Each structure stands twice: as structure tokens, then as C-alpha cells.
Amino acid sequence: MTVTVAEFEIADSPDAWTRAGFTVDGDPVCRVGGARIRLVGRERGSGIVGWSLRGLPKSAGSADVDGIPTTHSAADPAQPASHANGATAIDHVVLMSPDLDRTVASLAAIGVAPRRERDAELGGRPIRQIFFRFGEVIVEVVGSPETASEGPSTLWGITYVVADIDATASFFGEHAGPVKDAVQRGRRITTLRHRDLGMSVRTAMISAIPER
């Protein structure tokens, strides 16, 4: 069975996400594409504090995934909501790893294999990006190709697909950076100044994959 993302838990208030143009249900849950984002409040800390996954093997038990709090889910995919900021789906989530080999092994243990990898630089230091597909969501694992350290992996940021990147940038105004070409050919991206909006998760918006 394919492992897919059912839900992210994020330690933010619903008001912050409403200000950012997301539609938030009463639970409070934000439905983006087939995934749910449950806003659990700052009492739980900050950032992405856990996730729920469908299709986990029974052998996974109740263990976390490389230190990330993980819950088994049997919930059906969410019915997508309409959002004023133009978000239509989650493109990818960034998972920061202190030990790439360990993280890849942890994901293999739940039945997820890498699709591709890419070497790059971040702040002048070499990094390796390893990409995994969890249904409609890509998980981009990022870490050093040269060193490994102790500690858990963390879910670091989310990039959303939007219907019209220029309209989205206009919606956010000064709260978004300039629209620029993305690494993926034919796509464009803008990064939010998320803290200005009261959000604790690093957030970007990207145009859809061009039709061929």
C-alpha cells in the first residue's frame, strides 16, 4: 500500500493562517489538496510538530519516523477547500536530517524509497536533497553529504502549489518576496515572510507544473 500524508500538525493559531489567506475549518483544520493541516496552537511549541500517514506497514508499530512524531491514519483524503491566497495543493515538505543515511533507512523501513537526489549548496555549505513521493506530496530530505550528527529529523517547511503565482504574490504584497524562477524548469516561486503573518512554518508558493 502506498504511504501518503493524511495530516500535518502545526503549532500555529487559526488567526495567523486566516491572515495568510487560508480557509480554516472549525476544528481548526485547513484542507489543502488532499491533505489536512491541523492547527494545534502555540501551546505545542512552534513549526510542524507531527504528521499522520496512511498506508504505514504494520511492522512500523507506533514508532516515530526518524524522530518525527508520527500517527497512523485511516482517514480518507480531504476534500480540497478554496483559499484566497490561491493554494490548491501541497507541492512538497522539507525534512531536515542530521544524518542522511539514517533518515533514508527510516523511510525505507516504512516502505518509501528515494526517487532522485540532487547536490547543491546552502549558505556556502554542501547539501544533498533526496526526494521521496508520499502520494501527492513530495518529501524533500535535506542534509549534509559529508557529516552526520545525533538528534531527530524535523519537518522544516512547506511549499504550496498555487493557481496563479502573480496573483498570489499580489495578494501577499509586502509579506512575500519577489517571484523568481524555481529550480524546476518552467515553474516560478515566491517565499513568504511568514513571521510577519504570525506563522511559525517556513512557507513558499510555487506555480503548477506546466502542461506538456
Model-derived regions, located:
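Glyoxalase I/VOC metalloenzyme domain signal
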Residues: 1-115, 133-212
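Beta-rich nucleic-acid/ligand-interaction surfaces
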Residues: 120-131
